[in-house]
């Protein structure tokens, strides 16, 4: 199942409530403000702080 990019208009980082960016290749949502990466599983974003990983560029 593919991630619906329209969700980017309504979802926010659970930590800072900021905008998220979509990384299609890695199937992740990225919060650059907090430098956190949230996984997308089967097209569903997992926006739980304890599931986030540090952003490594």
Curated annotation (Swiss-Prot):
Protein origin, superkingdom:
Bacteria
GO cellular component terms listed in the entry, alphabetical order: cytosol
A Pfam match: Trm112p
For this protein, the record's SUPFAM superfamilies field holds:
Trm112p-like (SSF158997)
UniProt xrefs under HAMAP family: UPF0434 (MF_01187)
For this chain, the family text in UniProt reads: Belongs to the UPF0434 family.
Q: Which PANTHER family match?
A: PROTEIN PREY, MITOCHONDRIAL (PTHR33505:SF4), ZGC:162634 (PTHR33505)
The entry's protein name is UPF0434 protein Shal_2504
Species name:
Shewanella halifaxensis (strain HAW-EB4)
